[in-house]
Amino acid sequence: MDPSSAGSGGNSLPSVGPDGQKRRVCYFYDPDVGNYYYGQGHPMKPHRIRMTHSLLARYGLLNQMQVYRPNPARERELCRFHAEEYINFLRSVTPETQQDQIRLLKRFNVGEECPVLDGLYSFCQTYAGASVGGAVKFNHGHDIAINWSGGLHHAKKCEASGFCYVNDIVLAILELLKHHERVLYVDIDIHHGDGVEEAFYTTDRVMTVSFHKFGDYFPGTGDIRDIGHSKGKYYSLNVPLDDGIDDESYQSLFKPIMGKVMEVFRPGAVVLQCGADSLSGDRLGCFNLSIKGHAECVRYMRSFNVPLLLLGGGGYTIRNVARCWCYETGVALGQEPEDKMPVNEYYEYFGPDYTLHVAPSNMENKNTRQQLDDIRSKLSKLRHAPSVHFQERVPDTEIPEQDEDQDDPDERHDPDSDMEVDDHKAVEESSRRSILGIKIKREFGENATRVQDGGRVASEHRGLEPMAEDIGSSKQAPQADASAMAIDEPSNVKNEPESSTKLQGQAAAYHKP
């Protein structure tokens, strides 16, 4: 795309997609986020966010969005989900003092995989504040919000996991539930979105759908039989995949499954975690998706014209991460960035071809047609969206007036968030696996049990109410209907984009603790 074609209407220009529907897109970025450093040899590199931003600037995409520098999430906001003692630890620990806190490091799973980095608490505040800020924007006229620094889906209520310290996704969903009866979470990272699923496993107001590598692979969760518990039964969907899945095979599952989920669940908002470690050639991944194949998930979810929060996640071949999230920003805007890459600050990273797209490899696709058919068959059971009544709503987050004439859009700030929250009981330590050791046996020991429906519920969650206690409760839902989610073959899938009425019929939602 020629940067000159981006338009001269400032950074509040609504974009028009292929479906003819206008989208108001906002984008959250803190220029300091690229300075955080996990340590020498660590695969997680926040520098990839700065690389992505540089590409967005050179492609002229920033001019088509409202760009905000996020306000850091405050302690009480973080404690809407996380245990206060855990947040206090993240705030106080430093590389210099960590040796004096060995017991707490072990308790909260902070160490080699999730190291104590300089400015750890500020880092968490930054990416969490951006995700919550994006959720707030949906209440003020925006259709799509983007935070590529977010999407850290492994963090638990009181422990770090898989390079993730604070679960910005859960915090954003809790914000969305103030105004939306049902919220859908979709995860296309190669790793199972265990932290988000766990947070909403027993409620029917949030539904989680995760497409991930399953087997001897971190975090070892996400069995197709894990479907939610109690009120949340059938509100967790897991799509376990094998090595080498390509664009065609992936979309043969993604579109029919998500088309049926949107039809049956009817969410008021969608959160899409766009982990780029599912791309071909990722340092820690084993899938074979092209950037266009990965972005097709964004394009498809965008077409429903439901408020859409796009978040980052995994991705460890950082030049491809930047390529992917730049292209997906273009998709969100209804644009098609040209393949030839403009000269930019990190141009040398993208040699020798200097293109936005890279060809997938010729690796074997171990996902057979029979396996894909079996997955569709097993997932073809989903109850209809339940009706829901709100408890007293949490006060709206107030947004001060923005200065539309401010010269530098990167200096804009999103509004202060003033989320009043209930404290939640901390859960016990969960079984820990390492994301750095990819081949990990999956076992069911004393800390897990299988309930009658085949769903797996960690022992610390048995008998607990949903961890997000302030999200309301549903009225008695209808019995599960075996025919409610008969997933069609991909050739039969047709998505009729909804109008700006944003999918009518909102009710309860579901998810894991």
From Swiss-Prot:
> Mind telling me which Pfam families this protein's record contains?
Hist_deacetyl
For this protein's source organism, the top of the classification is: Eukaryota, Viridiplantae, Streptophyta, Embryophyta, Tracheophyta
Q: Which reaction does it catalyse?
A: N(6)-acetyl-L-lysyl-[histone] + H2O = L-lysyl-[histone] + acetate
Molecular function GO labels: histone deacetylase activity; histone deacetylase activity, hydrolytic mechanism; zinc ion binding
Q: Which cofactors does this gene product need? A: Zn(2+)
**Gene Ontology CC entries for this record:** nucleus
The processes (GO biological process) annotated in the record are: epigenetic regulation of gene expression
Question: Where on this chain does Zn(2+) bind?
Answer: 189, 191, 277
**UniProt keywords, alphabetically:** Chromatin regulator, Hydrolase, Metal-binding, Nucleus, Repressor, Transcription, Transcription regulation, Zinc
Its function? Responsible for the deacetylation of lysine residues on the N-terminal part of the core histones (H2A, H2B, H3 and H4). Histone deacetylation gives a tag for epigenetic repression and plays an important role in transcriptional regulation, cell cycle progression and developmental events. Histone deacetylases act via the formation of large multiprotein complexes.
Comment on bound cofactor: Binds 1 zinc ion per subunit.
Compositional bias per record (Acidic residues), positions renumbered to this chain: 398-409
Tell me where on the tree of life, at the top rank, the source sits.
Eukaryota
Q: What is its main location?
A: nucleus
Keyword Acetylation in the entry? The reply is no
Q: What is this protein called?
A: Probable histone deacetylase 19
Stretches with biased composition (Polar residues): 492-504
For this chain, the family text in UniProt reads: Belongs to the histone deacetylase family. HD type 1 subfamily.
Query: Which Enzyme Commission number(s) are listed?
Result: 3.5.1.98
Show the active-site residues. 154
Residues annotated as site: Polarizes the scissile carbonyl of the substrate: 316
